[in-house]
Curated annotation (Swiss-Prot):
InterPro entries: Thioredoxin-like_sf, Thioredoxin_domain. SUPFAM superfamilies: Thioredoxin-like. Its main location: cytoplasm. The gene is Txndc9. It is found in: Cytoplasm; Nucleus; Cytoplasm, Cytoskeleton, Microtubule organizing center, Centrosome; Midbody. This is Thioredoxin domain-containing protein 9. The modification Phosphoserine is found at residues 188, 221, 223. One of its GO terms (cellular component) is centrosome. Residues 75-180 form the Thioredoxin domain. It comes from the Eukaryota. Significantly diminishes the chaperonin TCP1 complex ATPase activity, thus negatively impacts protein folding, including that of actin or tubulin.
Length: 226
């Protein structure tokens, strides 16, 4: 009997706590509803105007990006074009590629998708065989390499597929996450939770991306043999 009494008492405590929590939620909702009821027509009109202004600004920004070539993944024809393209856009992802390198085609597929999704960023692809000066200046040694630029300056590099899980089968979401780590796109996910299906599969911990200085180092590209 004593055991049953303890259970009944425990159940009663839980029930009271649940009722108290429900009451708090109810009071909060009542308070929010009351606030809405107290908003006058002038205030509602002001909120509406602010919302419309924000929408107009966003649309204008979108049109500006599109006019500068954002929203599509494009090849640039010359080294001079590169400097002009980078100068006019705040965020740029630049894929240094070679036609004969298989992994470049893998990146092409993912970058074409991300270019349409992230209008805030310009996505370009110069052919390394047509841009020797540019490759020398940026010290591009591995093909493929993504140069990530902000305000005309190189902020980071993605060299080969090491940061993408060391696999050719990485997802578009994985590349998107990696670009987000360098703040070259507006990433809405959690940077501390990379979208790998299995981190152990790659034998590397990517939960915290370490900053690497790539400029000035020499690399060999096994992908050039493809």
């Amino acid at each position: 009997m004593e055991g049953n009494g303890s259970i009944d008492m425990f159940s009663e405590v839980l029930e009271n706590q649940f009722l108290q929590a429900a009451k708090l939620v109810e009071n909060h909702l009542d308070s929010e509803i009351q606030k809405l009821d107290q908003i006058g027509e002038d205030e509602l009109e002001l909120l509406k105007e602010k919302r419309l202004a924000a929408l107009r600004k966003a649309q204008q920004q979108k049109q500006e990006w599109l006019s500068k070539g954002h929203g599509e993944y494009r090849e640039i024809g010359s080294e001079r074009d590169f400097f002009q393209e980078v100068k006019e856009s705040e965020k740029v992802v630049c894929h240094f590629y070679r036609d004969t390198t298989f992994r470049c085609k893998i990146l092409d597929r993912h970058l074409a998708i991300l270019a349409k999704k992230h209008l805030e960023t310009k996505f370009l692809k110069p052919n390394v065989e047509k841009a020797p000066f540019l490759c020398e200046r940026l010290r591009i040694k591995v093909i493929p390499t993504l140069a990530l630029l902000r305000d005309g300056k190189t902020q980071d590099y993605i060299v080969g597929f090491t940061d993408l899980g060391n696999t050719d089968d990485f997802t578009t979401e994985t590349l998107e996450w990696r670009l987000g780590c360098s703040d070259v796109i507006n990433y809405s996910g959690n940077l501390m939770e990379p979208p790998f299906q299995s981190q152990k599969k790659f034998g590397t911990n990517f939960t915290k991306l370490e900053k690497k200085t790539i400029r000035g180092k020499k690399y060999d590209s096994d992908s050039d043999d493809d």
